[in-house]
Regions:
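Alpha-helical transmembrane bundles and membrane-interface segments of multipass inner-membrane proteins
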Residues: 2-199
Length: 199
């Protein structure tokens, strides 16, 4: 079955190249996933400065894997799956852990995780049914990711310096507005595309 999308992917399902999917970009993505338990542990023990360093390293690997994949034409189906998964796991684990140590309100994390679960379910259904549903990122989706990351980073940074988290109230309001709006937009777009004939 051909991969849906506009990118040309390196063959990672070739039986003569069983490890073709394990290139440098994908290895960097896997490293990012492996850093998540370290990141969670540092947050739980409130070693916020070290947690920020781990986030910085994760961010560097995120930038490098995409750059290398494009420059060396090493984009694969495995990478297309793992890269957003790693980003989402990193963000979600941050929200859940920071809520567990009472630095982020639980309701915020519930909204964030519920939106992500809805998108994950929609993506899985689209792949399973081979539906004509466009799951490409939108402006709202990218804005949501940026604001969520900024919020988590600043919560950790302010906590490491014992500063008042109420300073982030305007950012929190904006982040939640984007989170809810993007979730509803993806839901609406998926509903419309699901009812349209396949192209």
């Amino acid at each position: 079955m051909p991969y849906r999308g506009s990118y040309h992917f390196a063959a990672d399902g070739d039986p003569e190249r069983p490890y073709a999917g394990m290139n440098i970009p994908n290895s960097l993505t896997i490293l990012r996933i492996l850093l998540i338990p370290v990141y969670i542990g540092l947050l739980v023990y409130e070693r916020f400065d070290q947690a920020l360093i781990v986030l910085l390293v994760a961010g560097i690997t995120d930038a490098l894997d995409g750059t290398i994949a494009r420059a060396a034409n090493q984009r694969t189906r495995l990478g297309a799956f793992l890269d957003p998964l790693a980003d989402k796991l990193l963000l979600t684990s941050g929200f859940i852990t920071l809520s567990s140590i009472h630095l982020i309100p639980s309701w915020v994390t519930i909204v964030v995780v519920s939106r992500d679960a809805m998108l994950l379910l929609g993506t899985a259904v689209a792949e399973f049914t081979e539906s004509n549903i466009d799951i490409a990122p939108t402006f709202l989706g990218k804005g949501t990711t940026f604001l969520q990351l900024a919020y988590v980073l600043l919560v950790i940074f302010l906590s490491s310096h014992h500063m008042d988290l109420a300073l982030l109230s305007p950012l929190l309001i904006g982040m939640m507005a984007f989170t809810v709006s993007s979730g509803l937009h993806y839901l609406y777009r998926g509903y419309r595309r699901a009812g349209s004939p396949a192209s």
